[in-house]
Each structure stands twice: as C-alpha cells, then as structure tokens.
C-alpha cells in the first residue's frame, strides 16, 4: 500500500514507533541514570490494548507497514503479548518489532513470536559483564545474552542489537563486537550518543561521531547496503566473512533527516513528529471508540503537515526530550 502520510517535503511515512510505557527497570547512564521516576502517569494512565488497537488500525489504514513497540521497557507490561496480538490484527502491518533491554527475553520470547512479533532489538552497550553492569545499573549481562540465544531458538532469523557509542566507554571495542557477530546473524547497530535535556554533561564528555567507525569499516572491506522504505535510520554494512551486519545511526550527520520515514506516538497517546520536536498532538480523545477512526486519521494527516524539515540538534535544541524513556528513542 502506498503511504497516504506524506509531509511538505515529500517524505513518506511507513513506520510507527509506539511507546507503551515509560517505565524501565534499568538505569542506563545515557537514558535514566537516576532510575525511573514517575512523571505523574500511573500504569493505568498508559494506552490500553483497545487504544493501541485503534491507533495502529488508523496508521495501518494510512499506509503504515511497520510498528515498533518501545518504552521504557515494553515487556514490563503484563499485557505485552496481548498488545502484540492487537497490532497483528492489521494485515497491512507487515513488521511488528520491539526494542527491549532483554531481561525477559529468555522467558517470554517464544510467546511473543507466537503472538505475531517479527523483529527484536536488544540494547547491549558492552560485551564485558562488569562494564554492562556499570552502564545499566543491573547485573543482567548473562541473562540478556541467554535471551538473545532464546530468540534464535524461537525462530527469529536475525536479532538486532543496539549499542550506544560512547567515547572512552566502548568506542574502542570494535574488534570485540565484530568477533561476536562473525558467526551470528546479528545486526549490531552503533548509535551516536544524542544530547537530551537531562544529558548535556554526559554528551559533552562521551559523544563521538559514528563516522570514525564508518571509515574503519570501509577500510576493512565492509560494504554499504541500500535502505528499504520501511527501514529505520541505520546505514547498514555487510562483509562476506561475517554472518552479522553493522548498522550506524548518526543523527548529527548532514541530511540525516532527509530520509525520515517514521512517526512516534507516546505511551499517553501523543503524536510526536520528531524525537527532538516540541510538544505533541493529542490523539487520545479519538481513541475512545471505533467510530472515531476517520477523525483520528484526519488529525494524524493534518499534524504531519507541520513536521519540520530537520531537527535542531546541531543548535543544542533537544526539544521536549528530557530523557529517551519518555518517547521511546
């Protein structure tokens, strides 16, 4: 289906990132260094399964092909499997993925797959157990690794692993990561550290451009792959000697926003046109009843006309994003 979601700059939107909670049990230094602190929203305040069903139905009708469930940590919701199944009801949505810290993968991943999940991203910022503990605040490295193995055993042909690239923390560990994916079908995605409202000091201390890694990969014979229309923002590289792939997400690179194809809905039902945009468009009053779908689609389409051509990270403008758990990264 051709996307009906097209902005003023002729960008088409096939990809919805849907946050279902902002609660997380990890304390990652770049996201929630002081742990989760409720912002006045209780668990009962997050989108219900029926509301999720309605919002994804509207996006599917407008041409969305891929939905990624994010948080916080999505698997903390007891109804997470039901949420996957609700999204799966839309035939137009070909891919349903989750971004997770992985701590419940080993126990639940087979059930998620049975419910309709087609893709998994796991956050792993270090392959050293002690450093993993230091970054996340949780001594769960072996549990997360077992979860990745369980995902393959459950039938997932590929697992994506997200690694936030940080100077003097993990930027020098490329060889360790490459050895890990040599015989595993893992797409390892290095994500440039992004400045948020609460993370300016960390950003100044640890930001390093992904271009350093890209130059090194090209020097070693890695080959840049073409993007598909519902892919995320990663530049993906492959190598004939490796079962895995490398992805680079570099939001500070020139023209990063030119290929934007994704919209975001927060866990309380606000449409965000950009991860680092201002404010959000409330959709929740149109998620109460199935009869509101036409009005919901109209509001989404109208909001998209206001999407700006680019973010303003280069000007140190992080918008309303105080931390990445709020809107799901």
UniProtKB/Swiss-Prot annotation:
The keyword Iron applies. Pathway: Cofactor biosynthesis; molybdopterin biosynthesis. One of its GO terms (molecular function) is S-adenosyl-L-methionine binding. Binds 2 [4Fe-4S] clusters. Binds 1 [4Fe-4S] cluster coordinated with 3 cysteines and an exchangeable S-adenosyl-L-methionine and 1 [4Fe-4S] cluster coordinated with 3 cysteines and the GTP-derived substrate. It catalyses: GTP + AH2 + S-adenosyl-L-methionine = (8S)-3',8-cyclo-7,8-dihydroguanosine 5'-triphosphate + 5'-deoxyadenosine + L-methionine + A + H(+). Keywords: 4Fe-4S, GTP-binding, Iron, Iron-sulfur, Lyase, Metal-binding, Molybdenum cofactor biosynthesis, Nucleotide-binding, S-adenosyl-L-methionine. Residues 8-234 form the Radical SAM core domain. The keyword Manganese does not apply. S-adenosyl-L-methionine binds at residues 30, 72, 123, 194. SUPFAM superfamilies: Radical SAM enzymes. Monomer and homodimer. Catalyzes the cyclization of GTP to (8S)-3',8-cyclo-7,8-dihydroguanosine 5'-triphosphate. Belongs to the radical SAM superfamily. MoaA family. This is GTP 3',8-cyclase. It comes from Escherichia coli O17:K52:H18 (strain UMN026 / ExPEC).
